[in-house]
Amino acid sequence: MSTPPPDAAPTLEPVKPPTAELLIVTGMSGAGRSTAANALEDLGWYVVDNLPPQMLGTLADLASRTPQSLPKLAVVIDVRGKALFNDMKETLAALEHSGVEFSVLFLEASDEVLVSRYELQRRPHPLQAGGRILDGIRAERELLKDLRETADSVLDTTSFNVHALTRAVADMFSTSGPVVLRLTVMSFGFKYGVPADANFVADVRFIPNPHWVPALRPRTGKDPEVRDYVFATDGAQTFVDRFVSMLEPVFAGYRTESKHYATIAIGCTGGKHRSVAITEEVARRLSKSPRVTVNLQHRDMGRE
């Protein structure tokens, strides 16, 4: 930001330039501030919504004193505060004058698209008063014109849906490379119930049960003897190969749709032998996929 401090800027106590990042997210109502905030949270930012501009200095001071706790701080500010928003320009100038480093992301969209979004939600515009939605939009655009001119980044969301905006924010503010898909790969026993949060459920009870082999009964699918028994079965390795191949295009679609988490549940009768061995192999294979992290869990192993 390069706004010169005005003569009547609010007084702020000097603070050390923070090592934390401070991003101010603002712009037109209906342009996607909430979606942008959610995307930033997914990227690891700490997001504060609807903060009165006058409190920015206090929050920036806190971030500068605890950068380990708040390394990336995003603040969403809009015109819902109405009278409080009138001091926005002066507040930003005072922040800069006091040594606080920050950047501003301004979201906007065409009048026609904003009207259609409000009509779809059946909600009034915050500046509409007794007039039309378009009256509120035009009043807000006039109120924000100076802030838009000084923003570091202006993002036009006219042609965006939720997923496109999420991807755009990720492209702009991800500091760790491409967004990673986080997978939980879990074994379970059907007799204890299917995991409620599973996106995919596989049934490996087609494999002969090691439970009926006395030497294998006390062991688990993590033991080499059980694993060898399971994968000696015709179709076990083919199942893993095809299951993993089926998941790969699904994960590509998840990234396109900005879905960052998925749970894969693989079950047998008790969740001790077959599902554990198969889950271990599926997790090993999936962990080699690009832009994927795998959390391996055996929900029911040891439960019997």
Swiss-Prot record:
<dbReference type="InterPro" id="IPR053931">
    <property type="entry name" value="RapZ_C"/>
</dbReference>
<feature type="binding site">
    <location>
        <begin position="78"/>
        <end position="81"/>
    </location>
    <ligand>
        <name>GTP</name>
    </ligand>
</feature>
<dbReference type="GO" id="GO:0005524">
    <property type="term" value="F:ATP binding"/>
</dbReference>
<dbReference type="Pfam" id="PF03668">
    <property type="entry name" value="RapZ-like_N"/>
</dbReference>
<protein>
    <recommendedName>
        <fullName>Nucleotide-binding protein KRH_12070</fullName>
    </recommendedName>
</protein>
<dbReference type="Pfam" id="PF22740">
    <property type="entry name" value="PapZ_C"/>
</dbReference>
<comment type="similarity">
    <text>Belongs to the RapZ-like family.</text>
</comment>
<dbReference type="InterPro" id="IPR005337">
    <property type="entry name" value="RapZ-like"/>
</dbReference>
<comment type="function">
    <text>Displays ATPase and GTPase activities.</text>
</comment>
<dbReference type="InterPro" id="IPR053930">
    <property type="entry name" value="RapZ-like_N"/>
</dbReference>
<feature type="binding site">
    <location>
        <begin position="27"/>
        <end position="34"/>
    </location>
    <ligand>
        <name>ATP</name>
    </ligand>
</feature>
<dbReference type="InterPro" id="IPR027417">
    <property type="entry name" value="P-loop_NTPase"/>
</dbReference>
<dbReference type="GO" id="GO:0005525">
    <property type="term" value="F:GTP binding"/>
</dbReference>
<keyword id="KW-0067">ATP-binding</keyword>
<keyword id="KW-0342">GTP-binding</keyword>
<keyword id="KW-0547">Nucleotide-binding</keyword>
